Swiss-Prot record:
Location of this chain's protein in the cell: Cytoplasm
GO molecular function terms listed in the Swiss-Prot or TrEMBL record: DNA binding; tyrosine-based site-specific recombinase activity
Residue span, Core-binding (CB) domain: 3-89
Name of the featured protein: Tyrosine recombinase XerD
Residues in Tyr recombinase domain copies: 110-301
SUPFAM superfamilies: DNA breaking-rejoining enzymes
Lineage per the UniProt record: Bacteria, Bacillati, Actinomycetota, Actinomycetes, Bifidobacteriales
Subunit and interaction comment: Forms a cyclic heterotetrameric complex composed of two molecules of XerC and two molecules of XerD.
GO BP field: cell division; chromosome segregation; DNA transposition
Protein's organism: Bifidobacterium longum (strain NCC 2705)
């Protein structure tokens, strides 16, 4: 990466990470997208931001298409490029945002992986297998109940602190993207699981820490008494899913998708679900308003005058 791009990229990453307060994982994704974009530009002999044209941006997206990138991946990369060019314009590194008129490629909307209510029940039941007095089992059960009850992102679960939970009021405070806080209800199942973990699990995990100053704030601790990591949550979800016999692709975000879908199917208003999820735009939430094939068939059979 040449000097013309290097300084601008560094400033951009500081802007989104510090000034806008985006999560570390989000900043890393932006960094990767922009680095690949600039590498491609430099293969075309473009080494300064103000040398980029609209055609270059369009050609890059076309190159991604030829490389077999999915529509979702291309749309995400273009969104990163849009942010980068807008920032460059604001910094007077360019005289125009040449990416502004470049539209995201159209593609089939892919619905997120969602568990049925029965599958969620099996997953949460499987988390309790292994003994109710084992602190790790108590933690896993509390963690998964918390994630399904709140629909939180994995970063919000790992970042949760003890003082973010009010078990008497059944409320949790989540720190979302851009350091935006929101309050979400905690159901009775989650409250019972968290209470059991706090009473008989967390203290023992905290004592396992070799640190001079124990982890006093974090809600969920790992086996060594430190704040639990994103990777650990992934491993817990995967292992618990295997014990539950769930064959669908399973990751922490699956619980968030399932939370939203089950609320919509239960009659919740999409605007309410938007607030619970912490989405900035209702458009993002509307993917959960999809109708299941079973519901479509049932509605058709009961509504169409010549269905039967």
């Amino acid at each position: 990466m040449t000097n013309g791009f290097t300084r601008l990229t560094e400033q951009f990453l500081i802007h989104i990470g510090v000034e806008r307060g985006l999560a570390t994982a989000t900043v890393t994704a932006y960094e990767s997208d922009i680095a690949k974009y600039i590498d491609w530009l430099e293969t075309r002999g473009i080494h300064e931001p103000d040398a980029i044209t609209k055609q270059d941006v369009e050609d890059y997206i076309a190159a991604l298409d030829q490389a077999g990138e999915s529509a979702r991946s291309k749309a995400r990369r273009l969104a990163s490029i849009h942010e980068f060019h807008r920032f460059a314009l604001g910094q007077h590194a360019v005289t125009a945002d040449v990416s502004a008129a470049v539209k995201a490629p159209k593609g089939a909307s892919t619905l997120p992986d969602v568990l049925t209510v029965d599958e969620v029940t099996r997953l949460l039941d499987a988390a309790a297998v292994g003994g109710s007095t084992d602190p790790v089992v108590l933690r896993d059960k509390a963690l998964l109940e918390f994630m399904y009850a709140t629909g939180c992102r994995v970063s919000e679960a790992t970042g949760a602190n003890l003082d973010d939970i009010d078990l008497d009021e059944h409320i949790a405070r989540l720190m979302g993207k851009g350091s935006k806080q929101r309050l979400v209800p905690l159901g009775s199942y989650a409250c019972r699981a968290i209470t059991a973990y706090l009473n008989a699990g967390r203290g023992e995990l905290e004592q396992r820490s070799s640190a001079k100053i124990p982890e006093r704030r974090a809600l969920f601790l790992n086996k060594r008494g430190k704040r639990i990591s994103r990777q650990s949550v992934w491993e817990i979800v995967k292992a618990t899913g295997e014990r539950a016999g769930i064959t669908k692709p399973l990751h922490p975000h699956t619980l968030r998708h399932s939370f939203a879908t089950h609320l919509i199917q239960g009659g919740a208003d999409v605007r309410t679900v938007q607030e619970l999820l912490g989405h900035a735009s209702v458009t993002t939430t509307q993917i959960y308003t999809h109708v299941s094939p079973e519901t479509l068939i049932e509605t058709y059979l009961t509504s169409h005058p010549r269905a039967r």
